[in-house]
Design a protein with these regions (language model features):
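Activation segment/activation loop of eukaryotic-type protein kinase catalytic domains
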Residues: 159-203
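Catalytic-loop of the protein kinase fold
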Residues: 142-159
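Conserved end of the kinase activation segment
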Residues: 210-222
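Short beta-strand micro-motifs within the conserved protein kinase catalytic domain, predominantly
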Residues: 61-77, 85
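C-terminal lobe substrate-recognition/regulatory segment of protein kinase catalytic domains
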Residues: 285, 289-308
């Protein structure tokens, strides 16, 4: 897969620590970052330092880190981590996951392999456990003075023993870190305990203050809590069926090869989000205010006094 500033690969490995850390045996996750391509606030060197410093059952583990120099002008950082088999996105997009009181569907086929791995018997137990473990991961980071700043379903994985793992500290912020605002100038009344770069987070999971780039910074820890809430809300939003052709060949292929047998496509779904970010930040802000209402005073939303 590819992120904004990185590429992620599935790599073979003989490291025994992979299994110990709940990863798929014989494989590792290899994240590669070209240090000259990354842009603020992405910082692979800080990410490595944070992964080396932190240790929690619900956070990913850094098994190794090294650099490559394919040419005199390029330095690529390589982060080796366990390859976890399930992404929360896969769970949320499953048609077998419905907010009902009856037991979850039997894990009898590949589509429901996540059920077999996670071992939950009711919808309530799945939601409760995910919430508890994600809260524990975030609480640990915040206790260490670290804000994640990109909490979303695709950054939440599950190990082979069903343990939730929060990954990707690429845009994380620390209380000891003095972040340079996009303007290049620190506000005279801004403190070092604020984060300033608002271009963090992803889509519908971004806190509303990030959409308006407050001049005096924002509370990155509160932004994490907002993201936590929007992620957990996804367990209760609508499951939408993808609009795809019912057959696996386009019309022009059917014209050229009329004798080719037609095979129906499997049904696929995706989980809607609490707020709609499909049309950009303005639409997202409007949707947030439509659901939550507008704040009635600056004390309810201090950053609002310095929106740009």
């Amino acid at each position: 897969g590819h992120g904004l500033c990185s590429s992620v690969y599935k790599a073979r490995t003989t490291l025994q620590a992979v299994v110990k850390e709940g990863g798929v045996a014989g494989y590792a996750c290899l994240k590669q970052v070209d240090i000259d391509v990354q842009n603020a606030p992405h910082d692979v060197q800080r990410e490595i330092a944070l992964l080396q410093r932190t240790r929690h059952a619900n956070l990913t583990v850094l098994l190794a880190a090294f650099t490559d120099t394919p040419d005199p002008f390029t330095t690529i950082y390589n982060l080796v981590m366990p390859l976890y088999p399930i992404q929360l996105t896969d769970v949320l997009d499953s048609p077998h996951l419905q907010p009902v009181n009856c037991p979850l569907a039997d894990a009898t086929n590949e589509e429901t392999s996540w059920l077999r791995l996670l071992g939950f018997h009711t919808y309530a137990s799945l939601v409760s456990t995910c919430f508890q473990q994600l809260m524990q991961a975030i609480a640990y980071l915040h206790h260490e003075g670290i804000a994640h700043r990109d909490i979303k379903p695709s950054n939440i994985l599950f190990s082979t023993d069903g343990m939730l793992k929060l990954i990707d500290l690429g845009v994380a912020w620390e209380v000891t870190m003095r972040e340079l605002p996009p303007s290049g100038l620190y506000p005279s009344n801004g403190g070092s305990d604020c984060a300033y770069i608002s271009d963090v987070g992803s889509g519908a999971f971004r806190a509303p203050e990030l959409l308006f780039a407050p001049k005096n910074g924002y509370d990155a820890f509160k932004a994490d809590i907002w993201s936590l809430g929007t992620v957990m809300a996804s367990f209760f939003t609508a499951l939408l069926e993808d609009e795809i052709p019912s057959m696996d060949y386009p019309p022009w292929e059917r014209e050229l090869f009329p004798e080719r047998p037609m095979r129906p496509r499997p049904r696929t779904c995706h989980r809607s989000t609490l707020f709609d970010s499909s049309s950009g930040d303005i639409t997202l802000a409007c949707d947030i205010f439509k659901v939550c209402g507008l704040p009635s005073s600056v004390s309810d939303w201090p950053e609002a006094a310095h929106f740009q």
